[in-house]
């Protein structure tokens, strides 16, 4: 039996798309706060291509939402795997009927259904949906995943024969050397970056570090940036190794990533470097890193002294076993060791393995143990309703709980209040809840937060009809709907007093619904839009 790229089983999968395979992103590519959990198939810049079931199975789950994966389908197969198809523009056949019936029964445009094996069975190659650009997609494509059905863990689809055979080697573009604490935390302003061109260091065969990289209470770590070219583009790195004297110091391999551990990307990569546009894979780990794709028990951290010199070899390998190696020496100049004992004084830094409860004038912060990846500057600023804390160039692993104590007013409903995060000049809505009379949110970003009162109803603008009639004979009605304060919650369309399914695209702020009636049969259109703070706007249009 033939295996796919090292697998012991032959998976004879049908391609998800009928066009030639062109891949825009690989499994494991570095993204904000998560690994890319699948592969992105290009669709030639268009929507509406047939999506095929890769094998016999049944639709086990389907969801419609304006955010995230948009319209997404999950298919369970008989081999213990689940395939996922995200950003669909439309469902087809029996699946389309099942979704529409559910929307009508629930009178809700955003639904999630879990189906048994008899609801929508599929054969290998059968079409069940069309490709699209719904949800958080930035352009037409198919985001495709393979998951282990029993655990819902995403697996690398390239290992199942779902990509083009690749003959190109990955490359390393730069090497970065870090000064680290004994715990593996990155010491500010103690690093050196060396460019790599055609397999050669810009510094020759050796990286020479100042004597202060030798630390009594510290270590050294290595990181690399690079890319993996293939026949239709270039993606991120898959497997990385670093050795010295033939001893394996560190090894990572992105075969599978669970949703529970995907945020560990913020310590797998150089997070502050990523914020500035660099994608650096760290070849070492600190004490907060519990990511399971590390294949060695060692930490990858090096202990060197003045005048020390060691040979290093870095190898990066793609999913098709194409390999790229670079060998170089790492040396420390003569001089005095750095004797600093506390690189992160606790008067100015929060430390990852400690718990903090901070009480401010109108709110409190709860930072649990291991909420942080790295020691983080406090940067506390208390202005009552507005607070700022932490370092925007550092990430948060477990949410920091913000609790406002003074927020209620007898003049307004409790629902009218929310906590916002400053994003540029606008405050983004944060999921807000009430607990023991405290207004709370779970913060996953450092920065500025504010207690906000929202009494403004959402805006609704019809685009192809007015009180005087319809501007075209189109069977699709279109509105723009927006909420500039908090966040849209629900949107309902009634035609002739009958609830009609509608689709909202938050990127364009357009709400669309397809009408089955003839234009001349419509005598009333009612649209109701509400936000998460309970504000509601209703527009009713009657036609003669």
Q: Where are the language model's segments positioned?
A:
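Conserved structural position at the C-terminal beta-strand
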Residues: 226, 316, 527-529
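Contiguous beta-strand segments within globular domains
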Residues: 197-242, 394-403, 469-485
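Short, solvent-exposed loop/turn segments at the edges of extracellular beta-sandwich modules
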Residues: 317-322, 530-535
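Surface-exposed, short loops/turns at beta-strand junctions within beta-sandwich domains
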Residues: 303-309, 443-445, 515-522
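Proteolytic processing hotspots in large secreted/extracellular or virion-associated proteins
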Residues: 338-340, 345-349, 374-418
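Exoplasmic/lumenal beta-rich domain surfaces
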Residues: 82-118, 185, 190-211, 241-303, ...
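Proteolytic cleavage junctions
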Residues: 344-358, 394, 409-416, 420-481, ...
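Surface-exposed, glycine-biased beta-strand/turn segments
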Residues: 7-82, 89-91, 109-118, 123-124, ...
